[in-house]
Amino acid sequence: SPREMATTMKPEQVTGVARDLGTKLRERGITMDFAPVLDVDGGSANGAIGDRSFSGDPAVAATYATAFAQGLREAGIEPVYKHFPGHGRASGDTHKQTSRTPALASLKEVDLPPFGKALSQVPAPVMLGHLVVPEWGDLPATLNPAAYNLLRSGDYPEGSPYDGVIVTDDLSGMKAISDRFSTPTAALTALTAGADIALWITTDDLPKAIDEVDAAVTDGRYPREKFEASFARATSLQPDK
């Protein structure tokens, strides 16, 4: 687990582990890994992240997540940092229920700095979590323009402006979303809020989602220039042949 790696290995050893893993993934035709977790562990109150977090210390979490991302990158695999703006101290498991974070000021003190540090050292895509931040109302971060604006602006400690790819967590199989929204509605809401890639785990709703996005671009609810910018960012991840 990431926790075990952080307590038993040096960062350069973790880079080697990730490089070996990435090599095996690439041999199987996989070019992206939705890892590493940048969440800062909040203790037993949040079992959703647990030992997927490298550490409860923001600096340690950032160091080891960056080392892991570097190893994947060296193997030709695109890493993805998650779960912005920080799941480690949130209440509840987004697979099962709504999950609420501490106040934004607390996120900026503890949970957000690792994202800034990691992105400055090994730039990579970022996955948003289905996290409700008190100051942003009741809409989860994956569907909330405020979350995308914060990530893009870099307006948090250690942060800087970000123009990379942003992907959502799963929009179809996690109750924090599926209890409230259909998959096509969630996908369109995420894209118009600022996501570049709307992720879900089945193809069942794909035709309807495509139709809804097409209609939204046509009628202006999803501005064409915004759609084209996201498309350009997403397709920039296509691997070298």
Q: What does each model-found stretch correspond to?
A:
Residues 1-73:
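A substrate-binding/cap region within the structured catalytic cores of diverse enzymes
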Residues 18, 65, 210, 228-231:
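Hydrophobic face of alpha-helices
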Residues 45, 91-92, 239-241:
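Secretory-pathway/luminal and periplasmic proteins that interact with or process carbohydrate-rich
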Residues 52, 82, 152-156, 233, ...:
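Short, cationic motifs built from Arg/Lys/His that form the positively charged side of catalytic pockets
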Residues 59, 63-215, 221-222:
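Second-shell residues forming the walls of enzyme active-site clefts
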Residues 215, 219-241:
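Mid-to-C-terminal alpha-helical segments outside catalytic/metal-binding sites
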